[in-house]
Regions:
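Short beta-alpha connecting loops at secondary-structure transitions
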Residues: 50-52, 57, 100-108, 201-207, ...
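Glycine-rich, acidic loop regions that bind phosphate or pyrophosphate groups
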Residues: 38-139, 319
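Glycine/aspartate-rich loop-and-adjacent alpha/beta segment that forms the canonical ThDP
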Residues: 316-381
Length: 381
């Protein structure tokens, strides 16, 4: 049958199991799916990877798991139960026994080190020659990557710069061993989808708690711990507003952190969650200070970017300058992030939200949302 094992991975790197994961995938002809937390440790030099799964994931990752007959979960306490298949066999390997079966209906749970357990499995498994399922998922993944790349081609408009384009440029400019810190919210979405692993890069976020305003303090810690590595803080305007005092700390300790602000003038993820539930957004718009001027007042270099044509040159300048730099980029407040699988209830809720905006005299917001996300809307319908 056109089905096969699929494998979901979390924080495998800490168990130094990258080579073993590749070897197991090769032996089984199985696609590899990873979580956001595991992306930097799993994606690179991996011919079997088919993208990320979870709330911020991709359709290819989602369907690889749901179309498989067996799912092997390695080192992941996957929190998004709604994205896990419930009608296939699931095996889970984790060094912490309390995680086994906590989220998923597990048929086989093994407590142990991922690397050592895979090594033992490799000696016991016969090679699988049928690669039909793997090739099907890889083909789907190629289509997903083309769609993601297409969203970066349109740079946006004045004060409505497309965040996908910004993050793709950051990915190209950042060093191969950069440490990224991502604020919880929409910034996480763009980082998850457009920052690519190299085997040396690392990404920090509030992955377990999902708390706001984590990027800047994490960047400070990373810069102090690894003074020879490039540290890039990817902040939302909401998150940065909560940690403005940390800019003084960055200057005080002369930390060469590059702070990129995705300033959409709103609590974007909260706004999206309200819209999906059929509610017009309320109290999600932000009245922000001029973050570049705040940075200058604190003693660091600050840039404002409102024109999409100035994004690349400003980022180049920021990365080349010594010392801390803040780049405040005015991104599109209506940019949406689609989950890997859109449920009917989400579509209905979003439509209800747009209707309520219309009847409350906010028709321009509806028009702006459609104009900003026509490619996403085309995919859905």
């Amino acid at each position: 049958r056109d089905r096969s094992p699929s494998r979901g991975l979390g924080d495998v790197y800490k168990r130094q199991a990258h080579e073993e994961v590749i070897a197991l995938s090769e032996k089984l002809n199985a696609p590899v799916v990873y979580t956001f937390k595991g992306k930097m440790e799993v994606q690179y030099e991996n011919p079997y990877e088919v993208g990320m799964t979870g709330l911020l994931g991709m359709p290819s990752g989602y369907y690889s798991m749901h179309e498989a007959e067996v799912l092997l979960m390695l080192g992941t306490d996957f929190p998004y139960s709604a994205f896990l298949p419930d009608d296939i066999k699931i095996a889970q390997i984790d060094i912490k026994p309390e995680r086994l079966g906590r989220r998923a209906k597990v048929d086989i749970g093994l407590c142990g080190d991922v690397r050592m357990t895979i090594q033992a499995l490799l000696r016991m498994l016969d090679p699988k020659t049928d690669d039909t399922f793997l090739l099907k998922q890889l083909k789907r993944y190629e289509g997903v990557k083309k769609d993601l790349a297409a969203y970066t081609e349109n740079k946006g408009d004045i004060k409505k710069i497309h965040p996908e384009y910004v993050m793709s440029e950051i990915d190209k400019l950042a060093s191969d061993d950069a440490i990224f810190t991502v604020d919880t919210g929409m910034t996480c979405v763009w980082g998850a989808r457009y920052l690519q692993a190299t085997g040396k890069r690392h990404m920090l976020g509030s992955f377990n708690h999902g708390s706001m305003a984590n990027a800047l303090p994490q960047a400070i810690g990373a810069a102090l711990a690894y003074p020879d590595r490039q540290v890039v803080a990817l902040c939302g305007d909401g998150g940065l507003s909560m940690t403005l005092g940390d800019l003084e700390t960055v200057v005080q300790y002369k930390l060469p952190i590059k702070i990129i602000v995705f300033n959409n003038r709103s609590l974007g993820m909260v706004k999206l969650e309200m819209e999906v539930d059929g509610l017009p957004d309320w109290q999600t718009n932000m009245l922000n200070p001029d973050f570049a001027q705040v940075a200058e007042a604190m003693g660091m270099t600050g840039f404002n970017v409102s024109n999409p044509e100035e994004v690349l040159t400003t980022l180049l300048n920021a990365f080349e300058l010594d010392g801390p730099v803040l780049v405040n980029i005015m991104t599109d407040p209506n940019a949406l992030a689609m989950p890997p699988k859109i449920e009917l209830g989400q579509m209905v809720g979003f439509a209800q939200s747009m209707y309520k905006l219309l009847i409350n005299g906010r028709s321009q917001e509806v028009i702006d949302t459609i104009n900003s996300n026509y490619k996403h809307i085309r995919e859905v319908f």
